[in-house]
Amino acid sequence: MEAIDELIDAAQTFYEDARATENGRSRSWEHCYRVFRVARTDPSPDYDYLSLHLAFYLASWGMYRGSSFLLQKDYKVLLPVVEEVLKPEYDCLFGVACADLRESEVQERHTKVYYDIAAYFGPIRDEVAGREVASSVSPVLITKILMGTLGCVPAYD
């Protein structure tokens, strides 16, 4: 029960911070999620605009720190990720309710998009490092992307 209480407290703190600070970093998630929600129903979404929103959201949540390979790239490196998460096959993930997380389709789609993003970033990270990096792409980065674009998973940090 302690873990659940911690989760509830963290969510409450996040919510209170977002409401108390008009231009606080907590709002960057809200802006990112909103533009992706609108884009899901747009027959021709502006991928460049969405990539910029995603990049700023990721930067405001620490994913563009000095040790991050993303810091060496501009926001357009996220274009293929944006195109991927907007595919109709991931509609079942968008804002998924907790009760639906056990559905096999939801689990399959979540696993697929997670590993597709990881596979995309792997070679980019290797190129920035100038060598093959043995470790996997950060789950924190991938889950922050999924949280900001689909709202289907909390960030694992």
Model regions: which residues?
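An N-terminal alpha-helical hairpin/helix-loop-helix interaction module that forms a charged
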Residues: 1-134, 152-155
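Ampipathic, surface-exposed secondary-structure segments
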Residues: 143-157
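Helix-hairpin-helix
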Residues: 127-147
